[in-house]
Amino acid sequence: MMDYKKLGLKVGIEIHQQLDTKHKLFCLCPTLTREVEESNFEFFRYLRLKRSEIGEEDRAAKEEVERSRRFIYKYYDTTCLVEADEEPPREVNREALLIAIQVAKMLNMEVVDEVHVMRKIVIDGSNTTGFQRTALVAFGGFLEVDGKRVGVATLCLEEEACRKVEDGEGYAVYSLDRLGIPLVEIGTEPDIDSPEMAKKVAARLGMILRSTGKVKRGLGTIRQDVNISIRDGARVEIKGVQELDILDKIVEYEVLRQVNLLKIREELKQRGARVEEKVFDVTDVFSNTKSKIIRNKTVKAILLRGFGGIVGREIQPGRRLGTEFADIAKTYGLGGVFHTDELPAYGISEEEVSRLRDAVGAEDGDAVVMAAGDAVRVERALRRIIERAKHCLVGVPEETRKANEDGTTSYLRPLPGAARMYPETDVPPVVVTEEMLNVEIPELIEERARRYEKLLPKDLAWEIADSPYYRVFEEYSEKLQPTVVARVLYLAPAALRREGVEIERLEERHYRLVLDMVLRGDIAKEGAEEALKLLCQNPEMSAGQLKEKIGAAEDIDGFIAKLIEEKADLIAERGEGAFKPLMGLVMKEFRGKVDGKVVAEKLKKALKSALSQ
């Protein structure tokens, strides 16, 4: 295990949380997500780089321009000309601003006197404008985790970016449904000193945000960006961590990557390694190749003196230095790169590798990296890889990386600089009034859970306290047993999810409908799960329809139990083969009253239980 204190680990977290407001941040469109198939129109753009007010160019944006990609946008009947950047933005959404101020006060922050909107250059296609609108709302706060105080540097109110739905060679497709949804960005100071603490801080920030009851939930509604550095390493920003469970693993693997890159630097220095500036056209070497991957494509290569055996070296689980180079190539629309540490392979023969080495003048101990595809893209990608290879002689480059599902990371772009920010002239500033500052501070989920522990088991108390339907629980717990209400709101949906039922179709009105039916005695508490299942299948069912269906289902349970008992000899003789004749008897009684699939499911379950005894 690594000694993080000795390594000088510093971690800062940025939480991006979508707010559950009626309208988007700068227009009156609803904050709904849509299916791409529902799009009724599309348009495309090419984005160009704008210099800052003092004439500087942001390095991350500059690299994106070199990729010269076409961006296609999916439009809906719930989006407008503001998202398309064909109309100026409206004023800042006051509802979103009040939520941001509320969160700031919960984090002991100083709220600014006047909120000014800025433009942050982003030309990766995720914003039609070529920039993201962001506004500083508060600064200088803190939160406590395990007795340690972690500083909260800033809280910004931002517009959410577009959702990427496709990435191809030379183009990307984005959906406009998400663009403009209000979100808060909370950035901590780099006070976190271990992977475990990073996870705990992120969990606490998430809990504080959910305590407002005004944030969206579900995959993609909250993202963690993590800034990580070690002594002699560099600050690296890892974007898009959606699963809290792997956050500690991401920190651990990034530290490992930086440690390994520093080891590579020392070894390259000892070898006297250097990077040749020339990009060689080696298409002729592969003119008769059997490799389908590079056949009939322009093939170019670069020479890395003294890098032999190092390009193929693992720096994170399942990822090598060559993978870092391949990540760069992919950002230019290529499939990746090949290098001599892994060749011959991919249909490339040993003889072709030998001719490749001769063509670029490689000696023993050297490595050759090559790419195939469109000539211009290959040239640009290899030029960028030359710069990355040079940095191996220096150490760890500052860059923005993407979180992978296994906790490793991939290259995205250089770390952006200060040149990416400039004022937004279309949106007037907002003066923060005393009335706005007097916003109510809500009860924290952890405090609510402690109250519920008097009514429910500890684990269940936390789940209900953290549920978006906790107010429904409080209301109905005055009329029904709290455990019965908890069963309807949490235990039954959890069981249905395990069965593969789409419980996402359930809304608050459905839970209220079922609870009201239990309260009136229309259905037994045991029938609540079946009622919710039926509502998932048909969300518009009425109480009367549910009562009829569940009544029949309860009748069938009794009938099947009695039938299993009466036909014990048949079951003993034929085992699972008894299903067909038993099914016939049940359907004779219930045909037209209960769905055949439901009958089969219940009978199979009862038969399996009888055979296991």
Swiss-Prot record:
Disulfide linkages recorded for this protein, renumbered to the chain, are none
Q: What class of enzyme is it?
A: ligase
Keyword Nucleotide-binding (UniProt) = yes
Q: Name one GO cellular component term.
A: cytoplasm
Signal peptide region: none
> Mind listing the UniProt keywords for this protein, alphabetically?
ATP-binding, Ligase, Nucleotide-binding, Protein biosynthesis
Catalytic activity as recorded in UniProt: L-glutamyl-tRNA(Gln) + L-glutamine + ATP + H2O = L-glutaminyl-tRNA(Gln) + L-glutamate + ADP + phosphate + H(+)
Q: Quote one Gene Ontology molecular function term.
A: aminoacyl-tRNA ligase activity
Q: Could you say which EC number(s) this protein's record lists?
A: 6.3.5.-
Q: Cite a single GO BP annotation.
A: translation
The family classification in the record reads: Belongs to the GatB/GatE family. GatE subfamily.
What's the subunit arrangement here? Heterodimer of GatD and GatE.
Report the function annotation for this chain: Allows the formation of correctly charged Gln-tRNA(Gln) through the transamidation of misacylated Glu-tRNA(Gln) in organisms which lack glutaminyl-tRNA synthetase. The reaction takes place in the presence of glutamine and ATP through an activated gamma-phospho-Glu-tRNA(Gln). The GatDE system is specific for glutamate and does not act on aspartate.
Q: What is this protein called?
A: Glutamyl-tRNA(Gln) amidotransferase subunit E
Specify the taxonomic lineage: Archaea, Methanobacteriati, Methanobacteriota, Archaeoglobi, Archaeoglobales
Gene name?
Answer: gatE
